[in-house]
Amino acid sequence: MNQNTLDSLALRSDFRAIARWVEPRSTVLDLGCGDGSLLSLLGEELEVKGYGIEINDAGVLACAQKGVNVIQQNLEDGLRLFEDDSFDFAILSQTLQTIHQTAAILRETVRVGRECIVSFPNFGYWQHRLSVMQGRMPVSKSLPYQWHNTPNVRVLTIKDFEALAPEVGIEIQDRVVLHDGQSVRWGELAW
């Protein structure tokens, strides 16, 4: 494992869980790919053929510097570039809470990917609830921003996502709840 892979794993606790679901040598579309760290990791470890969609100039540049295929585009404009089932896996990794047209983008994700992987910070986590009860917006490893500089435009819980999933064509096949990068039982720390 090279230093870039180790750095990617250190940055995002959900990357390892996502990598477990992706099949070797598959095709992957990472929606809101940021600096391309997930695609770089999947390429190195699983030899996937990956593409990223990113709107941010710095993210696009970082992808290019890592050799990650990236298209600069706003997800809110849809995924008309891609035909149905263009990819084995379409991934929304810590992206869902940053977009306005959540249902539309989830439908597009289902359309272009044979399977979808979605990760998001759970605002229902008990420590986040406690912060709100104490009059403050939560700040944690999974929510590292203050209320005034967060890229998040949505707050959701695991149950919220489970309720929306059937409406947008998602059948949840598996799930993992993480706390500090470790898998926890479904009822222990999250709602």
Regions found by a protein language model. Give the residues of each.
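Glycine-rich SAM-binding Motif I of class I
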Residues: 36-40
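Class I SAM-dependent methyltransferase "Motif I" SAM/SAH-binding loop
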Residues: 32-34
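Short conserved loop adjoining the S-adenosyl-L-methionine
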Residues: 78-84
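A short SAM/SAH-binding and catalytic strip from SAM-dependent methyltransferases
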Residues: 89-100
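S-adenosyl-L-methionine-dependent methyltransferase catalytic module, highlighting the catalytic core
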Residues: 103-108, 115-191
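Class I SAM-dependent methyltransferase Rossmann-like catalytic core
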Residues: 1-11
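Conserved alpha-helix/loop element of class I SAM-dependent methyltransferases that forms part
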Residues: 9-25
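Class I SAM-dependent methyltransferase SAM/SAH-binding core
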Residues: 41-78
